Amino acid sequence: SRRQRQMCIRDSYRRLRNTLRYLLGALSDFDKKEIIDYSDMPEIEKWVLNEVYKLSKKIIEYTQNYQLGDIYREVYDFCNDDLSSFYFDIRKDTLYCSSYDSVERRSCRTVLNILFTCICTWLEPILCFTTEEAWKTQNIDENESVHLKEYYKANDLWDNDTLSKKWEIIRNLRLKVTNKIEEKRREG
C-alpha cells in the first residue's frame, strides 16, 4: 500500500541520515594528520576499504547509466548491513576507548573519513539537501559544495578478493553466534 511504501522510504532515509550523523560525530575533531597509510591498517579496515572499492565500481557504472535507484539501494544496503550492523558495532570501543594516537583508532577514523566522503558524493544527486548539510558541517572551512565534488577515487590496492571471502565467513559466524545469544535471551 501507499502508506507502507512511505514508511519504507522514511525508514531507509532515516538509516542513511543516521549513518551520516554517526560519521559526523565520530569525525568531529578529525585532523588530516591522523590519516594512516593503508599498509599500516588492521585487517578490518582493509576489509571495509575493499567493500568501498567494490561498491565504488558499481556506483560509477550506475551513474553512467543513470540508475539512481540502484545507487540508493546499494548505498543503503552498505550502510545498513556492512556499516551499522557490523563495522560500526565492532569499532565503537576502539573509537571511544582507545588512546587518541593508537593505530587502531587512527585507522578507524581514516576509514570513517573516507566513508563520509564516499557516502556524501554517492548520494548527493539523490539526497541533495541532506548531503550538502552534512558536507558543510564536516567541512566548515571549505566553501565548495558537495555537488561540485567528484566521487572519491578508490585505490586499486583495496581490491582484495581473499580478504573479502575471509570476512564473509567471519560475518556469517558472528551472525550465527548473535542469533543464538538472542534466542537464549528470549528464553530467559
Predicted region positions:
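Short helix-adjacent coil turns
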Residues: 63-70
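Short runs of predominantly hydrophobic/aromatic residues within well-ordered alpha helices
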Residues: 13, 20, 72, 76, ...
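Acidic, turn-prone loop/beta-hairpin segments
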Residues: 30-57, 88-180, 184-187
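Core structural elements
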Residues: 12-24, 43-55, 73-95
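Single conserved hydrophobic/aromatic residue that forms the stacking wall/gate
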Residues: 1-9
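Residue-level signal for short amphipathic helical patches enriched in basic/charged
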Residues: 66, 78, 82, 126-129, ...
